[in-house]
């Protein structure tokens, strides 16, 4: 079985680092690089792109809302046109940095509140998908299954890669449990290993209510800001490889 591992990376600013990006880059097949609004800055973005190139890792834009203090997790009211411009700005910045480093951007993966907006609002999803297709029709859109952005992306001819979030709890409707609730973030390597093995074996996840639901995904996400993220990502890779799987970049998965 071929499957990807991806992580949101470069989510610091200045001298602040949220995790060991270098160690994480040795584990993943795709890096979603913060583009300066919720986290990241030009120096960090450049470092991430060059490190990804060195490690043979694909790079994607990880745009978020302009909310450095809230790490892009707070809702900011804006219409679809405003959201589109904020996204385009960030993708363009990473494209330029990647070109300067001799690498290229292959995908887009939305961060937190921005992701929630395009996942839930069909009008916003349509506007954003059209903008991505205008920038580069070869871009792959990373998202959760059944999100509006997946529908909108496919409508305009973009490829999509759906995700299983190994470090986040799901409810019985297949939605992520709010981070405000207990046990919404999975930090135990044993629990992550069990979840990944179950997903690989049966395509299911156990919800926070204890039920089993199907999850359709081609790549497994670990958030870099989850405590112990490097160990968790290493656990994901180990479970995949011990089961005979192959960690594979997104562009290869969708060929």
Curated annotation (Swiss-Prot):
CDD domains referenced in this protein's UniProt entry, alphabetically: LamB_YcsF_like
Database matches in SUPFAM superfamilies: Glycoside hydrolase/deacetylase
InterPro entries, per database record: Glyco_hydro/deAcase_b/a-brl, LamB/YcsF/PxpA-like
Enzyme class of the recorded protein, top EC level: hydrolase
An individual GO BP term: carbohydrate metabolic process
EC number: 3.5.2.9
Keywords: ATP-binding, Hydrolase, Nucleotide-binding
Pfam families referenced in this protein's UniProt entry, alphabetically: LamB_YcsF
Protein family membership: Belongs to the LamB/PxpA family.
Subunit-level organization: Forms a complex composed of PxpA, PxpB and PxpC.
Function summary: Catalyzes the cleavage of 5-oxoproline to form L-glutamate coupled to the hydrolysis of ATP to ADP and inorganic phosphate.
Protein's UniProt name: 5-oxoprolinase subunit A 1
Organism: Bradyrhizobium diazoefficiens (strain JCM 10833 / BCRC 13528 / IAM 13628 / NBRC 14792 / USDA 110)
Taxonomic classification: Bacteria, Pseudomonadati, Pseudomonadota, Alphaproteobacteria, Hyphomicrobiales
């Amino acid at each position: 079985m071929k499957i990807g591992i991806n992580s949101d990376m470069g989510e610091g600013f200045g001298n602040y680092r949220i995790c060991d990006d270098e160690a994480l880059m040795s584990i993943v097949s795709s890096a979603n690089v913060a583009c300066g609004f919720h986290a990241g800055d030009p120096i960090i973005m450049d470092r991430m792109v060059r490190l990804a190139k060195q490690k043979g890792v694909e790079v994607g834009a990880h745009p978020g809302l302009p909310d450095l203090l809230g790490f892009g997790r707070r809702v900011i009211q804006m219409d679809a046109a405003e959201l589109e411009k904020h996204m385009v700005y960030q993708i363009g910045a990473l494209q330029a940095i990647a070109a300067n480093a001799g690498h290229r951007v292959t995908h887009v993966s939305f961060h937190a509140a921005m992701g929630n907006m395009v996942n839930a609002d069909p009008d916003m999803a349509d506007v954003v998908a059209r903008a991505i297709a205008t920038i580069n029709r070869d871009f792959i859109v990373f998202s959760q299954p059944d999100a509006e952005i997946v529908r909108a992306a496919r409508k305009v001819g973009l490829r999509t890669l759906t995700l299983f979030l190994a470090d986040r709890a799901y409810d019985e409707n297949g939605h992520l449990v709010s981070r405000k609730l207990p046990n919404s973030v999975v930090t135990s390597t044993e629990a992550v290993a069990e979840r990944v093995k179950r997903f690989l074996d049966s395509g299911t996840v156990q919800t926070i209510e204890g039920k089993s639901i199907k999850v359709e995904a081609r790549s497994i996400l670990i958030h870099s800001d989850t405590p112990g993220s490097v160990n968790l990502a290493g656990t994901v890779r180990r479970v995949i490889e011990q089961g005979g799987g192959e960690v594979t970049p997104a562009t290869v998965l969708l060929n």
